[in-house]
């Protein structure tokens, strides 16, 4: 049973519209859809809230550490609420998926994503769900850092917004219908 949804990103106005904050975007939209106002929770180093989907209480977490230190925030929440890795969904940007694509995955490595790398180290486990929001790759592989820390163009943002819409539905399906049905639905789009 899912208990915690975590959106990954970097805090601060200068990062708000960057591709690397795709996890924040989807978490914010989910909170808004459920009339949840995220509040600063210093003991979790995060913005934090609670929603109910299908009468099931779900915590929302938006770490306010930088992306590469997200594990600190996640570990604090998991200790406090006794949440196991299998009860967590991490929403993050994914270079290896084109814009407009979104995939749900259970378990696995970090795939070079430093936020996931830190979370895996902090939890001592890879056994959590990931909702991977495709942001595509830059043409020049040496420009990855600049690419993820820039805002997408309006055309690119349209594709990303479509995938965020699918992501919201996938979260609901994961909670109400289970991981297999959610994955099948999402991956058939």
UniProtKB/Swiss-Prot annotation:
<feature type="binding site">
    <location>
        <position position="114"/>
    </location>
    <ligand>
        <name>tRNA</name>
    </ligand>
</feature>
<comment type="function">
    <text>Hydrolyzes ribosome-free peptidyl-tRNAs (with 1 or more amino acids incorporated), which drop off the ribosome during protein synthesis, or as a result of ribosome stalling.</text>
</comment>
<feature type="active site" description="Proton acceptor">
    <location>
        <position position="20"/>
    </location>
</feature>
<comment type="function">
    <text>Catalyzes the release of premature peptidyl moieties from peptidyl-tRNA molecules trapped in stalled 50S ribosomal subunits, and thus maintains levels of free tRNAs and 50S ribosomes.</text>
</comment>
<keyword id="KW-0820">tRNA-binding</keyword>
<dbReference type="InterPro" id="IPR036416">
    <property type="entry name" value="Pept_tRNA_hydro_sf"/>
</dbReference>
<dbReference type="InterPro" id="IPR001328">
    <property type="entry name" value="Pept_tRNA_hydro"/>
</dbReference>
<dbReference type="InterPro" id="IPR018171">
    <property type="entry name" value="Pept_tRNA_hydro_CS"/>
</dbReference>
<feature type="binding site">
    <location>
        <position position="15"/>
    </location>
    <ligand>
        <name>tRNA</name>
    </ligand>
</feature>
<dbReference type="GO" id="GO:0004045">
    <property type="term" value="F:peptidyl-tRNA hydrolase activity"/>
</dbReference>
<dbReference type="Pfam" id="PF01195">
    <property type="entry name" value="Pept_tRNA_hydro"/>
</dbReference>
<dbReference type="GO" id="GO:0006515">
    <property type="term" value="P:protein quality control for misfolded or incompletely synthesized proteins"/>
</dbReference>
<feature type="binding site">
    <location>
        <position position="66"/>
    </location>
    <ligand>
        <name>tRNA</name>
    </ligand>
</feature>
<feature type="site" description="Discriminates between blocked and unblocked aminoacyl-tRNA">
    <location>
        <position position="10"/>
    </location>
</feature>
<feature type="binding site">
    <location>
        <position position="68"/>
    </location>
    <ligand>
        <name>tRNA</name>
    </ligand>
</feature>
<comment type="similarity">
    <text>Belongs to the PTH family.</text>
</comment>
<dbReference type="GO" id="GO:0000049">
    <property type="term" value="F:tRNA binding"/>
</dbReference>
<dbReference type="GO" id="GO:0005737">
    <property type="term" value="C:cytoplasm"/>
</dbReference>
<keyword id="KW-0378">Hydrolase</keyword>
<keyword id="KW-0694">RNA-binding</keyword>
<feature type="site" description="Stabilizes the basic form of H active site to accept a proton">
    <location>
        <position position="93"/>
    </location>
</feature>
<protein>
    <recommendedName>
        <fullName>Peptidyl-tRNA hydrolase</fullName>
        <ecNumber>3.1.1.29</ecNumber>
    </recommendedName>
</protein>
<keyword id="KW-0963">Cytoplasm</keyword>
<comment type="subunit">
    <text>Monomer.</text>
</comment>
<dbReference type="GO" id="GO:0072344">
    <property type="term" value="P:rescue of stalled ribosome"/>
</dbReference>
């Amino acid at each position: 049973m899912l208990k915690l949804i975590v959106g990954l990103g970097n805090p601060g106005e200068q990062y708000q519209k960057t591709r690397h904050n795709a996890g924040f975007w989807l978490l914010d939209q989910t909170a808004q859809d459920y009339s949840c106002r995220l509040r600063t929770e210093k003991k979790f180093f995060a913005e934090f809230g609670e929603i109910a989907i299908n009468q099931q209480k779900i915590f929302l977490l938006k770490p306010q550490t930088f992306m590469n230190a997200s594990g600190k925030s996640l570990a604090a929440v998991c200790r406090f609420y006794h949440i196991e890795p299998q009860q967590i969904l991490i929403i993050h940007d994914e270079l290896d998926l084109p814009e407009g694509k979104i995939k749900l995955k259970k378990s696995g490595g970090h795939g070079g994503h430093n936020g996931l790398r830190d979370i895996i180290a902090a939890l001592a486990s890879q056994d959590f769900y990931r909702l991977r929001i495709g942001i595509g790759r830059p043409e020049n592989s040496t420009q990855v850092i600049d690419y993820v820390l820039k805002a997408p163009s309006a055309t690119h943002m349209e594709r990303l917004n479509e995938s965020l819409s699918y992501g919201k539905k996938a979260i609901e399906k994961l909670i109400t219908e289970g991981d297999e049905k959610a994955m099948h639905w999402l991956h058939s789009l």
